[in-house]
């Protein structure tokens, strides 16, 4: 694989995270949570292709489906909370919990494609560690960009941003659930 092909692969793998994080960024998210989530996704996108390389196809399919459904359910819940807040004009949006478990679940939900890619990398002459590093860096930057874009859109749209963000999360959840 050429460097250009590796970069395109990394961008393709980072698009789920970018889309999700635009929606999450429209909620109330602190700077340290933005950094923590971006780093979590970066690490997942390094580790998952490596795990995929070693894990095997059967295990990947099983974990992929389970993680996809869990990730979809989490996104439905978050999307519902954001839409409800945007419609009802409650004073404070219930805060998404960015504790260790929350970060790990969000990171897992957007990195399952990277696990699948790891399976296929074993059939191609490529430096797995280099590809995993590039994939992680690109996904981390795309996560950060999505969160920051979501924050900016939220400032422009005000409370309506909660509805838009919630709808984005619901669309992504539907894609996750019905694609798998």
Swiss-Prot record:
The chain crosses the membrane at residues 6-26, 34-54, 63-83, 100-120, 128-148, 158-178. It comes from the Bacteria. It is a multi-pass membrane protein. Keywords: Cell membrane, Ion transport, Manganese, Membrane, Transmembrane, Transmembrane helix, Transport. One of its GO terms (cellular component) is plasma membrane. It is found in: Cell membrane. Coiled coil: none annotated. InterPro entries: Mntp/YtaF (IPR003810), Put_MntP (IPR022929). GO terms for molecular function: manganese ion transmembrane transporter activity. Probably functions as a manganese efflux pump. Belongs to the MntP (TC 9.B.29) family. PANTHER family: MANGANESE EFFLUX PUMP MNTP-RELATED. This is Putative manganese efflux pump MntP.
């Amino acid at each position: 694989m050429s460097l250009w092909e590796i970069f395109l692969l990394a961008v393709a793998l980072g698009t789920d995270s970018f889309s999700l994080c635009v929606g999450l960024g429209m909620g109330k998210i602190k700077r340290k949570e933005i950094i923590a989530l971006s780093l979590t996704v970066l690490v997942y996108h390094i580790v998952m292709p490596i795990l995929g390389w070693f894990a095997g196809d059967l295990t990947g399919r099983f974990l992929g489906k389970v993680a996809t459904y869990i990730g979809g359910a989490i996104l439905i819940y978050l999307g519902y909370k954001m839409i409800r807040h945007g419609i009802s004009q409650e004073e404070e949006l219930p805060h998404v919990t960015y504790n260790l478990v929350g970060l790990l679940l969000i990171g897992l939900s957007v990195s399952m494609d990277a696990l699948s890619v790891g399976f296929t990398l074993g059939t191609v002459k490529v430096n797995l560690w280099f590809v995993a590093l590039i994939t992680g860096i690109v996904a981390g930057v795309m996560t950060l960009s999505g969160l920051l874009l979501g924050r900016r859109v939220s400032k422009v749209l005000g409370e309506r941003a909660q509805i838009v963000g919630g709808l984005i999360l619901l669309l992504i959840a539907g894609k996750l659930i019905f694609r798998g």
